[in-house]
Structures are given as structure tokens and as C-alpha cells.
């Protein structure tokens, strides 16, 4: 009976070891994510004027509060041409007066694609 108890304890210890090993691998592989989160938290606490997080996030945060109409006006683009280019890229704008975040509440990829297409139309219309 005592041997059976020791066997079960050994099995528990082996599974505990695998669990700890798996957690260590997980934390090691997510080290960059952990550093990014800590940096963003430090920026938030210190009210840093120039945040150190990804430039792509900052770019999207800059444009997400503008509507397609406002972006077209600021970039001196024709709204129908911009809407046509967006629809060709399968980015369907429901209302050009609503902000990008309102048009795509949970889709950062579409916001980024809309920004990219608007900038391409503005600065290099021959690419399209």
C-alpha cells in the first residue's frame, strides 16, 4: 500500500515538473510581449509624451478617429475615387461620415488597410 502511494506521488511530481517546464517555455517565448506590456505600462504611469510602443499602433490611433471623408479632405483626394479603391480592396465603408473605428469596431487590419490605400492613392496613384 505504501508503494502505491509513492507511485502516485511520483506521477504527481512528474506532471508538476512538466507543468513548470511548460510555463517556463511559455514565458520565455512571450518575453518580448511581456517587455512591451511593461513598457506600455511605464509610459501610461509616467504620462510619457512620446510613447515607446509600436509605431503601427500609433499610426492607427492617429487615424482611427477620422472618417473617410475627413481623410479624403485632408489628403486632397476625391471621395468617390477613394471609396472606389477601398471597395476594390473589399473594404466596405457603411458610412463615409463615421470614423474608421465606428466602421470597423474590432478590425484593426481593415483600419490599417484603409489608411494604406488612402496614402497610396494620395502619394502614388499610378500604383493602383
UniProtKB/Swiss-Prot annotation:
It comes from the Bacteria. Keywords: Membrane, Transmembrane, Transmembrane helix. One of its GO terms (cellular component) is membrane. It is found in: Membrane. The chain crosses the membrane at residues 8-28. It is a single-pass membrane protein. Its main location: membrane. This is Uncharacterized protein HI_1266. It comes from Haemophilus influenzae (strain ATCC 51907 / DSM 11121 / KW20 / Rd).
Amino acid at each position: 500500500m505504501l508503494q502505491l502511494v509513492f507511485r502516485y506521488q511520483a506521477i504527481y511530481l512528474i506532471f508538476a515538473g512538466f507543468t513548470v517546464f511548460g510555463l517556463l517555455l511559455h514565458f520565455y517565448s512571450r518575453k518580448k510581449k511581456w517587455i512591451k506590456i511593461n513598457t506600455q505600462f511605464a509610459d501610461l504611469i509616467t504620462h510619457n509624451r512620446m510613447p515607446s510602443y509600436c509605431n503601427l499602433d500609433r499610426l492607427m490611433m492617429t487615424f482611427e478617429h477620422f472618417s473617410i471623408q475627413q481623410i479624403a479632405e485632408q489628403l486632397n483626394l476625391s471621395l468617390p475615387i477613394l471609396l472606389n479603391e477601398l471597395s476594390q480592396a473589399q473594404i466596405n465603408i457603411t458610412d463615409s461620415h463615421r470614423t474608421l473605428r465606428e466602421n470597423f469596431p474590432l478590425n484593426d487590419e481593415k483600419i490599417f488597410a484603409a489608411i494604406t490605400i488612402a496614402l497610396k492613392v494620395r502619394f502614388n496613384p499610378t500604383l493602383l
